Amino acid sequence: MKGLKVILAAVLVLMPGCLENLKEELVSCENVTGECRYEILRSTDYSRLHIEINYVTEFAPDSEAVDLLKQRIQETTDKTSVSVSQNGFGSTDSSYSLEEILAIEKEQRERHKSGNTFIIHILYLNGEYEDNDQTLGLAYTGSSFVLFKEQISDAAFFLISAEDIEKSVIVHEYGHLVALVNNGYESPHDHEDPDHPNHSNNEDSVMYWAIESQDIANQIDGEPPNNFDSNDLDDLKLMKEGKL
């Protein structure tokens, strides 16, 4: 009987913590793309940002694309530091559903936000996205996105290199993590494409809808943009200031 009381007491002690952890998981901004924008942009809750990249062997990210992403994050957030780690893994798949992407992230991802550091997780996959084989990149949670490296290479054209496309796509997907365009807020600027929600109507913006599509070569003349335009930047500034 005494042993039973000890067990019951342990359950009663553990339950509040378990319930609190469950509550945090249910209300976490990481459940919805764009919902973590304030945690990413501001330094109030997380002063540092770390980018964890997991890639299929032989489909590693271009170093210049990663450096550019770091630069864009430094330019648009209040973070005191931005760091990167990379790890490869094997895969024999050639097509990935969203469920499979989530499962791969769960298996490969090592870090989640904690202490003073917010974590952005990026997957680099071979093959294609099962739901849309034209997809070059996809932001699918509040802190994660995937790039389809093989599709990016296939999208390269005479005047547009795979490296330039990758730079655009990686910054574009980061833009979705910080809620561009009009994802959960209403911009004071008329720059959302009515035919492509949450994308810019300006082909000189990295948030232009065609950036994450394999049709990019047919939609953009010359080198694709890899930076935010003035309307995008003003939206991000207003978010940081708590005005959006």
What are these model-derived regions, one by one?
Residues 2-9:
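Sec-dependent signal peptide recognition
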Residues 7, 43, 159, 163:
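Residue-level marker of regulatory loop/turn positions in helix-turn-helix DNA-binding domains and
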Residues 14-17:
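C-terminal motif of bacterial Sec signal peptides marking the signal peptidase cleavage site
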Residues 19-129:
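Propeptide-to-catalytic entry region of secreted or membrane-anchored zinc metalloproteases
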Residues 74-82, 176-183, 238-244:
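Sec-exported extracytoplasmic/periplasmic mature domains
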Residues 114-188:
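Active-site-proximal segment of zinc-dependent metalloprotease catalytic domains
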Residues 157-232:
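The catalytic-center signature of Zn2+-dependent metalloproteases
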Residues 226-244:
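Short, low-complexity, Pro/Ser/Thr/Gly-rich segments in the mature regions of secreted, periplasmic
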